[in-house]
Amino acid sequence: TTEWQKGYQNLRNVNYFFEYYKVPETEETKDVLSMKGEAYFFRAYWHFYLLTRFGSIPVMDRFWDGNATVGGLQIPPRDRSAVAQFILDDLNTAKGLLHSRSQYKGLRVCKEAAIIMAMRVALYEGTWEKYHKGTDFAAAEDKSADLLGQVLTLGDELFGMGLALNTKATDKNAVNIEDAYAHIFNSKDLSDMTEVVFWKKYSIADGVIHNLSSNLGAGYVDNSGPAGLSQSLVDNYLNADGTPINPADGIFKDFNLTFKGRDGRLLATVMHSNCKFKSTSPESKSKAMLVEEYSEENKQIVRPPYLTEGGPARNATGYHIRMSIDT
């Protein structure tokens, strides 16, 4: 399959690095070793990519070109639990080589990213083995207790590394409590947000750009279909006090009241009245979004968020994404 090919092509690229890495120990500076740690990180990443899609797989732990014969390529798969442990071992090696986030402000793979990745792998495989025991998809040996224990151990290590959540108290640009959450997704520079351990910096001047904000503002995510957040997603957000909502309550028939007293992350994620709709186009002089009940009197000022457009530029639900647009 395409995913199988993608995973192993990327693993070959990483192992090509290991095959031709010839730096003498005396010249292995901390910067050189950190780059070596990045290779271990990505070898773990692509094995995890394959594990989550296929389960037990052949482990590509070396450069295979010397075995590029019909017989040499018949590498038997390892049990999924052994694959997971191989991934965790690579991430542990990466952790010991990588710089901390502070060195490059999150612009390169860092020690903290390796720990978080290891937690994700251990949690994924641990829960898989726990809940698939006795099925055709079970690991040969149930190691869920050990894997889930590793999550706790790694978490304790991560908590001592000085990362901090981006909150209204720490974010000088946050006016409302939800702003700090939104800024994680719509800020141009995440250097000082230590909660973001690995990110990519975009710059028009440097030619590093993307179209996501423009696409989302126009009502679509990609060219394959219309956008629109689902009702069930909106219903899953709690009230600000942590209690769940009852979607059957009459208050939620009113679009504006739907957002009253709700978790700030809902307000940061979904367009509602007073948001700057499609603010990614400065020349349009966008006004704040206004949602009112339709009538003949106000039909000129109330515009639905692309409900009636055609093709992919259409919102299929009426819940238009705000995250990464209203900046």
Regions inferred by a protein language model and the residue ranges of each:
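Aromatic-lined, polymer-binding surfaces characteristic
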Residues: 105-114
